A protein has these predicted regions:
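An intracellular "coupling" helix at the cytosolic face of ABC transporter transmembrane type-1 domains
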Residues: 10-13, 98-102, 118-131, 135, ...
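Short intracellular "coupling" helices and adjacent cytoplasmic loop segments at the cytosolic face
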Residues: 46, 82, 90-114, 118-120, ...
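Helix-loop-helix
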Residues: 47-51, 57, 147-161, 231-305, ...
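ABC-type nucleotide-binding domain
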Residues: 326-579
Length: 579
């Protein structure tokens, strides 16, 4: 938890002023019982109304001064805690963006969202309460005992006996409840994760008619959470009765022994009332400390989870921003004896991959499900690093490139078409912020998206809803292809990006890419033979290994894996035809 306090370094002034004003407020609060004692001993005893009014005015003044100090403290504590949360959220977001696919896969995107939202909010609230109470509550307890000591040394013994008893009672209850609250937080995280997964996979759940099963699992989880909360709540509910019983015994003792000392003339009636008020102040301060400790416990649990994310080191690190010189005569992309495996996998996903893709070539990649097609093309923009071997772009190892240079050379169309809320123009300018409308329309034309965009009322200024919900699957895919084409990348990667397109549109798309992107090296990952049949070179993957490389006719006649795929989709006559 202490690691996170560095985010308060820009709010040192607020972190000092907030607690300081809380101490000043506490001083005003400690003065109130003495003023009340004077009203009783002087004003009421002597029936001196002017004095009562005067002291009443002092009480009002103390109340207003205390309120002003409390509001000031709250302002500075809120400013510091909000700044803390903003800085922490910014750095965590930056750190998450620095992680490679491997780390994100390992931690889980749902977990990262929870850390960014719920855990940071908990830590932020903890800082706010900490700045307001960590000095005030102990100061009130100590101050009340000192003020009681100044009134009566003998009666202060009651305070010295009761205060530890109160503290121990609160400690005992919290010692039991804090582990309960930690379990509640874990179960709450599980509930949040389950909710997120259910909402994300709602269509799949309905497709398999799993609603009842999911509802039962969710109900069981929330019931377990409810039981845990009830247990913690019942134990926590003992705090107020237990502490008030102890305080009431203390008040009885003060009144009993104080009454005797009043008769003997050692102290006055007002001073006895002041002692009772100080005892109540101690009680409230200790209860506030209990709230503080509870929030610190929650904050600590959240801080541990946040630090766990910060402790994840990116396996793929960026070089400095100095561009590297490339070799214009080298192959555009070259794999040299590459081996790759996922962090949680026991076996390699790719084994001994070697091939060259020259500038301007179209490379088709095909293979069965799980053969490693997406894993292979994810190594080119360095989303993952190879375990062994080299991946070169323009003769330079991808590890030597700054991310900005390497990924600036590559246009990527992922399997899932992802669009962002905003205009079509905004989405098209993701690769090149300075892309003109002409550049965008050219890319839309190649991607077979120009016609439907022109029919939109606002054309390029048409708003796209979150995740492109107001577009069909085919429209989303064509827009993501167009986005990758904006800026004329040196390398274009199409990862099964025509799955939502009909065959006619797919043919027109491949023809347009071939005719209008001369010099661009294109990688087409597809399950369709028709999509890669006319490629200059086809790579056939089988269980992470290259089963064959060549043209369609070469592979059909010399690679059994490729021939089997062909005949599963085409007639023998169609399969034997070239292009």
């Amino acid at each position: 938890m202490l690691k996170l306090f560095r985010y308060l370094k820009n709010y040192k002034k607020e972190s000092i002023i907030g607690p300081l004003f809380k101490l000043i407020e506490a001083c005003f609060e400690l003065a109130v019982p003495l003023v009340m004692a004077n009203i009783i001993d002087v004003g009421i005893k002597n029936q001196d109304k002017p004095y009562i009014y005067k002291m009443g005015g002092v009480l009002v003044l103390l109340a207003f001064c205390g309120l002003a100090c409390a509001l000031t403290a709250q302002y500075f504590a809120a400013k510091a805690s909000l700044g803390f949360g903003t800085a922490l959220r910014r750095d965590l977001f930056k750190h998450i963006n620095s992680l490679s696919y491997a780390e994100i896969d390992s931690v889980g995107s749902h977990t990262l969202v929870t850390r960014m939202t719920a855990d940071i909010n908990t830590a932020q609230q903890g800082v706010n309460i900490l700045l307001r109470l960590f000095l005030r509550s102990p100061f009130i307890v100590l101050g009340s005992i000192i003020m009681a000591f100044s009134i009566s040394v003998k009666l202060t013994l009651i305070f010295l006996i009761i205060a530890p008893c109160l503290a121990y009672a609160i400690y005992l209850i919290m010692h039991i409840t804090i582990p309960q609250y930690k379990n509640i937080q874990k179960k709450l995280d599980k509930t949040n994760l389950m909710t997120s997964e259910t909402l994300t996979g709602a269509r799949v759940i309905r497709a398999f008619s799993r609603q009842k099963d999911e509802e039962k699992e969710f109900a069981d989880n929330t019931e377990e959470l409810r039981r845990q909360q009830i247990i913690a709540g019942r134990i926590s509910a003992l705090m107020n009765p237990a502490t008030y019983v102890i305080v009431n015994f203390a008040i009885i003792a003060i009144i009993w022994f104080g009454g005797k000392t009043v008769y003997s003339g050692s102290i006055s009636q007002g001073e006895v009332i002041a002692l009772v008020n100080y005892m109540n102040q101690i009680l409230l301060a200790l209860l506030a400390m209990a709230i503080l400790v509870t929030n610190i416990t929650k904050m600590q649990a959240s801080a541990i989870r946040i630090n766990d994310v910060f402790d994840v080191e990116p396996s793929v690190s960026d070089k400095d921003n100095k561009p590297v010189a490339t070799d214009g005569n080298a192959p555009c992309v070259e794999f040299r004896n590459c081996f790759f495996s996922y962090a949680s996998a026991e076996a390699d996903s790719l084994s001994d991959i070697s091939f060259k893709a020259m500038k301007g070539e179209t490379i088709g990649i095909i293979g069965g499900t799980g053969s490693g097609k997406t894993s292979l093309i994810n190594l080119i923009p360095r989303f993952y690093d190879v375990r062994q071997g080299e991946v070169l772009v323009d003769g330079v190892d991808v590890k030597e490139y700054p991310f900005s240079q390497l990924r600036g050379m590559i246009g990527i169309v992922p399997q899932k078409a992802v669009l962002f809320k905003g205009t079509i123009r905004h989405n098209m300018q993701w690769r090149d912020k300075n892309a003109t409308d002409e550049d965008i329309w050219n890319a839309l034309d190649i991607a077979q998206a120009k016609d439907f965009v022109e029919k939109k009322p606002d054309k390029l200024d048409e708003m796209i809803l979150q995740e492109g919900k107001n577009l069909s699957g085919g429209q989303r895919q064509r827009l993501t292809i167009a986005r990758a084409l904006v800026g004329d990348p040196e390398i274009l990667i199409l990862d099964d990006s025509a799955s939502a397109l009909d065959l006619a549109t797919d043919v027109r798309l491949r023809k347009a890419i071939h005719e209008k992107t001369s010099g661009m090296t294109v990688f087409i990952v597809s399950q369709r033979i028709s999509s890669i049949k006319s490629a200059d070179k086809i790579i056939v993957l089988d269980d992470g290994k290259i089963a064959g490389i060549g043209t369609h006719s070469e592979l059909y006649n010399g690679c059994e894996v490729y021939k089997e795929i062909c005949l599963s989709q085409l007639s023998e006559k169609e399969a034997q035809a070239n292009g």
